[in-house]
């Protein structure tokens, strides 16, 4: 029910439902344990229909509070990995808002540099999280026999593989954003762009059969080459 509300864009109704379930004496304890996680997930999903910067920042603040609470109180919960991924996505959104402000006319140079510094910090943390999650999921995949016939294990393996694919794509996407916080010609920018191009190339090679992932990796690769100034290579994609 909750997922359907989110999928249909009824974010306010989903938040009310979560509040009611949190207060309900008959709601399962297992669900109450993840209310803060689900609230953060709903708030972040709602950003897709919000345009005002002040409201966006308010929603991000609320989502971060909920995530902090879940992560602090449920460090061994099975959803801990997903929660940290959500936190990484939250950091990326904050960095993107900073970048939008940097691009606004009339913003003082000192403020621009401060915003860019904040963005770098947020994106570096997001990349660190994605890197840790990637290794964690990889180990979980390796612990399951790829030829298992156990239905539950097969389901888990499939879910892990999908998450692993997504995180592999998240990493170069975040690296590309991080590169954009440095001026053209800066050594840090060139190094990050090279890393992003290499990672996107690896994702394209590994997931040729997955059209959505392959397409996004191709777009990222073309953008990476373009930002490096390799227009001919960018046009190949």
Q: Where on the chain are the PLM-derived regions?
A:
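N-terminal, post-signal-peptide region of Sec/Tat-exported proteins
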Residues: 10-48
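"A position-specific structural signal for the A-helix of alpha-solenoid helical repeats
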Residues: 1, 38, 42-45, 86, ...
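Single-residue signature of alpha-solenoid repeat helices
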Residues: 14, 56-59, 63, 112, ...
């Amino acid at each position: 029910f909750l997922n359907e509300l989110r999928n249909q864009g009824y974010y306010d109704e989903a938040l009310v439902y979560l509040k009611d379930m949190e207060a309900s004496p008959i709601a399962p304890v297992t669900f109450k344990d993840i209310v803060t996680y689900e609230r953060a997930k709903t708030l972040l999903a709602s950003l897709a229909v919000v345009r005002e910067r002040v409201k966006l920042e308010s929603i991000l603040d609320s989502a971060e509070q909920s995530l902090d609470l879940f992560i602090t109180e449920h460090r061994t919960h099975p959803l801990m990995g997903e929660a940290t991924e959500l936190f990484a996505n939250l950091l990326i959104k904050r960095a993107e808002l900073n970048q939008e402000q940097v691009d606004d006319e009339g913003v003082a140079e000192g403020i621009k540099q401060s915003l860019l510094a904040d963005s770098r910090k947020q994106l570096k943390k997001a990349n660190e999280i994605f890197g840790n999650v990637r290794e964690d999921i990889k180990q979980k995949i390796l612990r399951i026999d790829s030829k298992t016939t156990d239905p539950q294990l097969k389901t888990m393996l499939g879910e892990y593989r999908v998450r692993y694919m997504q995180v592999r794509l998240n990493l170069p996407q975040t690296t590309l954003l991080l590169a954009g916080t440095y001026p053209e010609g800066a050594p840090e920018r060139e190094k990050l762009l090279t890393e992003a191009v290499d990672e996107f190339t690896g994702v394209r090679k590994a997931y040729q059969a997955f059209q959505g992932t392959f397409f996004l990796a191709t777009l990222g690769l073309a953008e990476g080459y373009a930002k490096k100034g390799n227009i001919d290579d960018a046009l190949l994609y």
